[in-house]
């Protein structure tokens, strides 16, 4: 039987999709050290962060149970479940794994990332097994933040960023909506990962940008009625902002789950608003 994940219509408004305000966009020291850690199970990977994410052990159980129901594919259960765990939300919101992780990735004190190294190794290994997508994706926030994105600025989003290629998702009142101050981002990316197969919110067809992506502001436009559009283009830094994970060859005996199908670049996908 195919795994049944949560559906967005059954959910309350999600803060992860509007977590954009936390991105200060400044240049920090690169993210390094995690790539030297061993690849371990998800249970082992979260042990060092239990004090920061108190409910994480229980959430790992749910994530791995869901991923175990998927048919064999290209990710191990632990790799797939690391993505599922990242997409989960619960109360209190500031204790969700995605929230604490992204907040730590944006912190100038890189030593605070040390407890996260095992999890970063696992989820970035998983994302490394998925093909990168060169396409335009979208995200937005119910706030006027255009002054932080002047035309020509080069910036970095240090956290993982959830995006969508389906504009109708952002128009939903749970996300960007149609009224009030709104900042809408169109992002020409080349590192997007289609994670909808592994997300708790499959109906939204999420495209996830990995941590430490650099962008240039191509344009910043006012569309009237407190609606602002910012065009970003992903660019490659002179030196890596995050050390890459060496990609091991999967074991023939490894239980792996399927890679999600990729839609053509001209078609819509779907999702979020977590810019930061």
Predicted regions and their residues:
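Cys-His-centered catalytic/binding microenvironment captured across papain-like cysteine peptidases
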Residues: 2-33, 199, 207-276
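Internal glycine-rich, Lys/Arg-flanked active-site/core loops of soluble domains
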Residues: 43-198
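Residues that form ligand- and interface-recognition hot spots within folded domains
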Residues: 123, 141-142, 167, 174, ...
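Generic cytosolic/nucleocytoplasmic N-terminal low-complexity/intrinsically disordered segments
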Residues: 3, 36, 63, 94, ...
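Compositionally biased, intrinsically disordered/low-complexity regions enriched for serine, proline
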Residues: 10, 27, 35, 45, ...
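A generic structural signal for well-ordered coil/turn residues at beta-strand boundaries
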Residues: 134, 181-183, 203, 211, ...
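Intrinsically disordered, low-complexity, charge-biased terminal/linker regions in eukaryotic proteins
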Residues: 1-73
């Amino acid at each position: 039987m195919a795994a049944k994940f949560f559906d967005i219509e059954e959910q309350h408004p999600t803060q992860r999709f509007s977590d954009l305000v936390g991105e200060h966009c400044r240049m920090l020291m690169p993210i390094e050290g995690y790539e030297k850690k061993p690849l371990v199970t998800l249970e082992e990977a979260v042990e060092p962060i239990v004090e920061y994410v108190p409910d994480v052990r229980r959430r790992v159980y749910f994530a791995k149970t869901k991923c175990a129901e998927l048919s064999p594919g290209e990710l191990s259960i632990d790799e797939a479940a690391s993505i599922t765990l990242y997409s989960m939300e619960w109360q209190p919101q500031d204790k969700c794994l995605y929230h604490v992780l992204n907040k730590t990735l944006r912190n100038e004190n890189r030593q605070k990332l040390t407890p996260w190294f095992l999890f970063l190794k696992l989820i970035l290994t998983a994302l490394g097994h998925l093909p990168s997508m060169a396409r335009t994706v979208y995200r937005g926030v119910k706030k006027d933040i255009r002054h932080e994105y002047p035309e020509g600025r080069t910036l970095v989003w240090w956290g993982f960023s959830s995006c969508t290629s389906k504009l109708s998702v952002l128009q939903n009142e749970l996300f960007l909506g149609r009224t009030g101050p709104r900042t809408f981002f169109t992002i020409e990316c080349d590192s997007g990962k289609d994670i909808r197969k592994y997300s708790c919110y499959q109906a939204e067809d999420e495209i996830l940008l990995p941590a430490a992506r650099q962008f240039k502001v191509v344009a910043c436009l006012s569309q009237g009625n407190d609606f602002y559009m910012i065009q970003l283009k992903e660019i490659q830094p002179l030196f890596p902002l995050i050390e890459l994970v060496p990609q091991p060859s999967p074991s023939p005996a490894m239980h792996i789950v399927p890679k999600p199908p990729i839609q053509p670049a001209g078609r819509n996908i779907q999702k979020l608003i977590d810019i930061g």
